[in-house]
Amino acid sequence: MTQTQTVTKDIAGDYTIDPSHSRLGFTARHAMVTKVRGQFEEFTGTAHVDTAEPGNSRVELAIKTGSIATGNADRDGHLRSGDFFDAEANPEITFVSTHVSRDGADWTITGDLTIKGVTNSVVIPFEETGTAQDPFGNVRVGFEGAVTVNRKDWGLTWNAALETGGVLVSEKVKLEFDVSAIKNA
């Protein structure tokens, strides 16, 4: 457990991800010398958390591909194009869990990640970062997780060779999840 973590009670129940207090992001190397960070600004998600039988837990996410944002309009447009996500033809990225396990505050979620019609299994370790009741009476739970994937596994193959060697965009991309979920009434 980290020093900032405050697991205050049993978090069993059904939750809806709060997109205004969550971040679904990514980090990739650019020109092999620096990292570019981005995120998806529109997404929905639900979770059923079963603390007694974690294997009965489940998570589903739907991410609007066209909501990708890196802070650079030209790059964002390129990422939305057919070279990468082809957001017009493939408006959603989805994740559906297939297995969940827990060890204290550490959760492992295995699931099917679908991008551009290609589905691959990924295993994402998460840390339960705490629970709280917000000023509006909502019970919230937080999770942070990350996994590194090879974008080519989903058909995201565009690249450009550099004169100095290497390529413009790394094949490996780190997917980052900072999630605040609200317990359903």
Where are these regions (language model features)?
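Low-complexity, acidic/polar, glycine-enriched regions of mature
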Residues: 1-185
